[in-house]
């Protein structure tokens, strides 16, 4: 689950991570009124969407007067902001964050992530702040420093100071930076985060260490422990199909292709998409129905896939372990009838009760194209979609 920058900064502030003063606004008039509450001569007007790259896309403006705040607010509100993370359609700006300007001396990057190679939380930092960290990793990887954190001990003060030294934080601000990083680590742990990232972290002319950005992703599996965080969810920023999928415990991510995929298991789903790509097709989604799919789940999965107007065919790839192939087959038949499917459909079943599952599909009288293997199924659906 993602949240807006201003919500992330409220969490930071509550846990001792230093941030500039700011206010959220939903209209240009409100933006001016909120700006009046800030003790500053420089205002930063920030578009609030669930995507990075807002600054480069024109979503962050520096205002030197209240009239400029109003001008920029009118310019941004209602705008479709297109960044490298939104896709060409962009995202509509519906709220703004009005923040105090500050005397920036230097920008840095810091982030806490989970390193799958070490199975540990890792602190990453660089003095190349304000730049996409992926770009830094590609061009100057030597400028990225890491500290692997012992889960028993947590982020040690010496690790925090070492990172601060390595990224050339001014000596007089080292202790403040170390305290800042330890507080940021506490946010990661106590809020069950999957990512906590600040780009940029800055040092100021007054010797302060501040977070000028706040990117926080939460572990969806831990949200039941954080009712307050659940309330921060902005459904308008999410794909309606993904919201609907979550109601039925389906893992769905929309993509840009035209072949809908329904698979059980994340690994098989990834392999299925790779195989479709290998044979010249383009997956329209990632959809994992999980290990306990029912007829109702399968029907809803079909409805969600068909909610994408770009879909021209569907590939169902099921390996029945805990989940039985005959149950899936019954669900497919019921779903195809209910949604009155007219698009090409290829189904590959393997595993428990597979022969009975195939019989159910064959006896249904529906236009379902069977496949014996994943490769065969991918080839068939790519061919059918291209011919459609």
Swiss-Prot record:
UniProt pathway: Carbohydrate metabolism; tricarboxylic acid cycle; succinate from succinyl-CoA (ligase route): step 1/1
Residues at which ATP binds: 46, 53-55, 99, 102, 107
Give a yes or no for keyword DNA-binding in this entry.
no
Note the Pfam families from the entry: ATP-grasp_2 (PF08442), Ligase_CoA (PF00549)
Q: Name one GO molecular function term.
A: succinate-CoA ligase (GDP-forming) activity
Entry cofactors: Mg(2+)
GO terms for biological process? succinyl-CoA metabolic process; tricarboxylic acid cycle
Superkingdom per UniProt: Bacteria
**Which residue intervals define the domain ATP-grasp in the entry?**
9-244
**Do you know which InterPro entries this protein is assigned to?**
ATP-grasp (IPR011761), ATP-grasp_succ-CoA_synth-type (IPR013650), ATP_grasp_subdomain_1 (IPR013815), Succ-CoA_synthase_bsu_CS (IPR017866), SUCC_ACL_C (IPR005811), Succ_CoA_ligase-like_bsu (IPR005809), Succinyl-CoA_synth-like (IPR016102)
Catalytic activity entry: succinate + ATP + CoA = succinyl-CoA + ADP + phosphate; GTP + succinate + CoA = succinyl-CoA + GDP + phosphate
Listed EC numbers: 6.2.1.5
Class of the enzyme per the UniProt entry, highest EC level: ligase
Question: Which residues bind substrate per the record?
Answer: 264, 321-323
UniProt keyword ATP-binding present = yes
Q: Which PROSITE patterns match?
A: ATP_GRASP, SUCCINYL_COA_LIG_3
Record's keyword terms, sorted:
ATP-binding, Ligase, Magnesium, Metal-binding, Nucleotide-binding, Tricarboxylic acid cycle
Q: How are cofactors bound according to the entry's free-text note?
A: Binds 1 Mg(2+) ion per subunit.
Write out the similarity annotation: Belongs to the succinate/malate CoA ligase beta subunit family.
Q: How does it assemble?
A: Heterotetramer of two alpha and two beta subunits.
| Protein task | Succinyl-CoA synthetase functions in the citric acid cycle (TCA), coupling the hydrolysis of succinyl-CoA to the synthesis of either ATP or GTP and thus represents the only step of substrate-level phosphorylation in the TCA. The beta subunit provides nucleotide specificity of the enzyme and binds the substrate succinate, while the binding sites for coenzyme A and phosphate are found in the alpha subunit.
- Tell me the protein's name: Succinate--CoA ligase [ADP-forming] subunit beta
Encoding gene, per UniProt annotation = sucC
